[in-house]
């Protein structure tokens, strides 16, 4: 891991800079021994308020970078999700920290972190190294964030703090990790390079700021030392974490970083969890549910080590609220996306104009496909008995999709 960190440092020195918007999201990683089919499963709900417009592109490979599927929200620096040709997948959750200083070089980095993972990482472990290198070289300029990264063999959580401090933990193969918008990494052992990585002064810096007092606090706990207290006590964060824990573990009180689920996790389970919405459940407790009014994309990454990357790695996308949209598979081997799914003809143009072409999206692109999905959300949120029947019918259709898909895979692989 240390060698990989060093090898990426020079490459990262030429990267550009950008600014942050932190909104609610939710993510899950299930290790390959915890899943029904032996895949690593990573799931993510992207939640962003305001006028959002999803575009989907396939960025071609170059001599220096990999091919990747890119789910883009114009103008957003912390919202896009990616899966590259090796199945390396990345998404993130805003996790506010208590850091009020933060050492930055050249203005720090933000959006470039996820794009660099998509372009250069051939494994999740390399993705961890890239993120760590960027944070240590430039500094992270947001308050705090946890990147979730996975490949067909393992998944990781990489938590960064404003400035140059970071830590990463591997999700055990037989366990499931869930994360709302607060840090979930607790006790850290940087000597265990198989399961942890991070900056060397992580503990010493916390001591120097008075965030960790060894004589009274016991073992060092990253989340307790670095997290914003408001994020840890947020009703929405706690509610979404409880909902996931209740589903996977049969309990509502979040415990360790990850735990063994009460049964093997399937693709369908991930769809169910991302779709938990109080409109359907009738749950009136305080705080946002996992699926909520700000959910603009739900993605599930099914990463199977026993099939070649092109067919074995699939990004399942529900374009909007997953409680009322169907998940559609995107294979890692595709070389281009349907033309109507992007506002530009090429991914290269979209990349060049990601920040500059981000205002008045509905006005400038009135015929964009995404607005039809947004209209469907509004229509589907009528809590009438008739509308609930529509939900049931859509769910039944979606329930059959993984069965047909798995039958196809078994036939040819």
Predicted regions and their residues:
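Short, well-structured alpha-helical segments that form the helix of a local strand-helix-strand
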Residues: 127-136, 267-280
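Secondary-structure boundary elements
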Residues: 120-129, 133-142, 263, 305-308
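Sec-dependent N-terminal signal peptides
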Residues: 4-15
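Substrate-recognition/cap regions that form aromatic- and gly/pro-loop-enriched pockets
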Residues: 279-407
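Long, repeat-rich segments with strong aromatic
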Residues: 234-270, 274, 292-294, 301
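A contiguous strand-loop segment
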Residues: 21-110, 130-255
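Second-shell loop/turn segments in exported
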Residues: 102-103, 112-121
């Amino acid at each position: 891991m240390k060698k990989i960190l060093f090898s990426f440092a020079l490459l990262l020195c030429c990267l550009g800079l950008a600014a942050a918007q932190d909104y609610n999201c939710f993510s899950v990683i299930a290790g390959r021994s915890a899943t029904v089919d032996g895949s690593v499963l990573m799931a993510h709900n992207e939640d962003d308020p305001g006028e959002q417009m999803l575009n989907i592109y396939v960025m071609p490979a170059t001599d220096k970078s990999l091919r990747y599927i890119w789910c883009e929200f114009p103008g957003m620096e912390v919202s896009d999700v990616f899966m590259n040709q090796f199945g390396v997948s990345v998404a993130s959750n805003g996790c506010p920290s208590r850091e009020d200083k933060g050492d930055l070089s050249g203005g720090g980095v933000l959006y470039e972190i996820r794009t660099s993972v998509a372009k250069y990482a051939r494994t999740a472990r390399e993705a961890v190294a890239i993120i760590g290198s960027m944070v240590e070289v430039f500094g992270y300029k947001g308050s705090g964030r946890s990147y979730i990264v996975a490949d067909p063999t393992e998944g990781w959580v990489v938590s960064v703090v404003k400035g140059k401090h970071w830590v990463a933990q591997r999700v055990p193969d037989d366990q499931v990790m869930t994360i709302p918008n607060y840090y979930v990494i607790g006790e850290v052992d940087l000597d265990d390079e198989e399961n942890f990585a991070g900056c060397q002064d992580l503990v010493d810096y916390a001591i120097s700021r008075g965030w960790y007092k060894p004589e009274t606090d016991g073992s060092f706990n990253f989340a307790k030392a670095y997290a914003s207290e408001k994020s840890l006590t947020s009703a929405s964060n706690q509610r979404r974490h409880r909902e996931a824990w209740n589903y996977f573990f049969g309990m509502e009180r979040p415990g360790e970083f990850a735990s063994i689920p009460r049964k093997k996790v399937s693709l369908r389970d991930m769809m169910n969890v991302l779709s938990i919405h109080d409109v359907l459940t009738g749950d009136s407790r305080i705080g946002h549910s996992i699926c909520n009014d700000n959910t603009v994309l739900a993605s599930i990454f099914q990463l199977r080590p026993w099939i070649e990357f092109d067919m074995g790695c699939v990004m399942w996308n529900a374009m909007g609220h997953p409680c009322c949209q169907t998940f559609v598979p995107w294979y890692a081997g595709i070389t281009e996306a349907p033309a109507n799914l992007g506002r530009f003809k090429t991914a290269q143009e979209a990349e060049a104009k990601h920040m500059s072409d981000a205002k008045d999206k509905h006005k400038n692109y009135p015929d964009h496909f995404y607005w039809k999905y947004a209209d469907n959300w509004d229509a589907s949120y009528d809590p009438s008995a008739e509308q609930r029947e529509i939900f049931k019918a859509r769910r039944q259709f979606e329930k059959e999709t993984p069965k047909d898909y798995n039958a196809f895979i078994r036939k040819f692989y």
